[in-house]
Amino acid sequence: LPISLYELVDAQGRKEYDGRKLIAGIVDRGSYNEYKSDYGQSLITAYVKIGGHAVGIVANQRKRTQTAKGEVQIGGVIYADSADKAARFVMDCNHTGLPLIFLQDVTGFMVGRDSEQEGIIRSGAKLVNALSNAVVPKITVVVGGSFGAGNYALCGKAYDPRLIYAWPSAQIAV
């Protein structure tokens, strides 16, 4: 990867960055087609081409986003709407036979009363179920942190990805 991509992701994991810039640096120019860009914005899901090969990408958005209701969502955290979107995307890619690439920089799932009322447990279970049933090739790239249940939800080792790569500054704790 060009040095500018390595510089995009803070080695200490403290700096926000736009996950779309990370994706743009690794996919074929003009091949980016985002899935539900205005929904579940703490995860980015997109149909892309890498080296001419069509794949689906699921990546963390590491900058703060705002929902349609005006609620702020912290970057790197999986919310109920994001988990729902990613589950549907994984199922679609599996149905069409598209390999999946996961770009992890995740602190985990959002917790708390509000998250529970929004259905984080149900939505997280949907994502885990979709991933465990996916038979397409999967590759995981840890670009920043990968912690707790977030590691599993974004194709951690338990889901048997074909390859797991980690950037030099990556941190993994389950």
Predicted regions: what is each one?
Residues L1-V174:
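Ligand-binding clefts of soluble mixed alpha/beta catalytic domains
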